[in-house]
Design a protein with these regions (language model features):
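Catalytic Walker B motif of ABC-type/P-loop ATPase nucleotide-binding domains
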Residues: 167-170
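ABC ATPase NBD coupling module
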Residues: 74-90, 193
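Helix-to-loop junction immediately C-terminal to a conserved catalytic motif
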Residues: 57
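A short, proline-enriched helix->beta-strand linker immediately N-terminal to the Walker B motif
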Residues: 161-165
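Conserved ABC ATPase signature
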Residues: 142-146, 150-152
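Short coil-to-helix segment of the ABC ATPase nucleotide-binding domain corresponding to the Q-loop/switch region
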Residues: 102-109
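Conserved ABC transporter NBD signature motif
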Residues: 65-73
Length: 215
């Protein structure tokens, strides 16, 4: 784990989230993740793990409190500026949500295409990301031809292709067997070793306890 002198990448200050039905997903939460740190969010279903990640990713907004990203409050960021902030993040879900009509290469390239990267740069970055997750030879395959573990690795490649400062993962091993789960966690460790801040929500305590990271 690489940590940048204790500087905080993410900080929650008294964050609460209440939904329209009156349910309090989070109440007065204070939390921080250092630059270059890898940590886990644990807890039972409904404990607010996914909500916390959605607030960081600006998929949802808090009811009260501050969310600091590199010292800047993003809790009330205008919608116009959200895409710029999200480019600093890679987001991975339990279901990778791959597009069935697009090849693996095209799925991974999607964030770069949206951001307006040149064709040559897209090719270089996509192939580097696929090589990192061990799927370069399958760049022309379609998602339905891959196993569940391979599809999750495609999701990870797509999340890191724009070289984010932060990786957020919501139950990334939830549908995988123990061996594949360990492989996915090893990938997160590799990205963390080059300075990426990693925050993973997981209820898999058996797997987490094998790893020496903050809970």
């Amino acid at each position: 784990m690489i940590s940048d002198g204790g500087k905080r990448m993410i900080e929650f200050e008294n964050i609460s989230k209440r939904y329209e039905n009156g349910y309090d997903a989070l109440k007065h939460v204070n939390f921080s993740l250092k630059k270059g740190e890898m940590a886990f969010l644990t807890g039972h279903s409904g404990a607010g793990k996914s909500t916390l990640l959605k607030l960081i990713a600006l998929i949802d907004r808090p009811t009260n409190g501050k969310i600091l990203l590199n010292g800047h409050n993003i809790a009330k960021l205008s919608n116009r500026k959200v895409p710029l902030v999200r480019r600093q993040m890679g987001i991975i879900f339990q279901n990778p949500y791959l597009l069935d009509d697009y090849t693996i290469f095209e799925n991974v390239a999607m964030p770069l295409m949206i951001a307006g990267y040149r064709h040559q740069e897209i090719g270089r970055r996509v192939r580097a990301a696929l090589a990192k997750v061990g799927l370069l030879k399958k760049e022309k395959f379609y998602p339905q031809s891959l196993s569940g573990g391979e599809q999750q690795r495609v999701g990870i490649a797509r999340a890191v292709v724009n070289k984010p400062a932060i990786l957020l993962a919501d139950e990334p091993t939830g549908n995988l067997d123990p061996e594949l789960s360990a492989e996915i966690m090893a990938l997160f460790e590799q990205f963390n070793q080059v300075g990426v801040s990693v925050l993973i929500a997981s209820h898999d305590l058996a797997l987490i306890t094998q790893l020496n990271y903050r809970l």
